């Protein structure tokens, strides 16, 4: 349990290492045919943001978390594209590169968006590389 707490603490430290007045919080859901995750995001600026995600459908003693630092390389009113670097800990241990698009199709609900994300993940436990795709929802506060 101490090892898990240390890992979660490290991810939280990386997630909140930077602080800026223009910060904005968000919540998200990611899913595919294999698993799902829920996340909490924090925008440090218009370009840089971080997210902490927790995998669902796992026992509480075996919670898997992933944290990522992301960069919006295209940001428009109706969509954003981003790339990032992250790590996943516990059930799966490794690093990943997310590449995604967030689309806000409703003009009167700009805080709500749909997203798709492609992840390349290097899993240290299996010494293998995987390609995962996710879809989901995001709401910014």
Enumerate the language-model features and the residues they cover.
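Residues that define the transmembrane beta-barrel architecture of outer-membrane proteins
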Residues: 32-38, 61-65, 79, 91-97, ...
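Transmembrane beta-barrel domains of bacterial outer-membrane proteins
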Residues: 50-56, 62-69, 79-89, 113, ...
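Sequence/structural signature of outer-membrane beta-barrel proteins
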Residues: 34-36, 55-59, 72-76, 88-92, ...
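Cleavable N-terminal export/targeting peptides
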Residues: 1-24
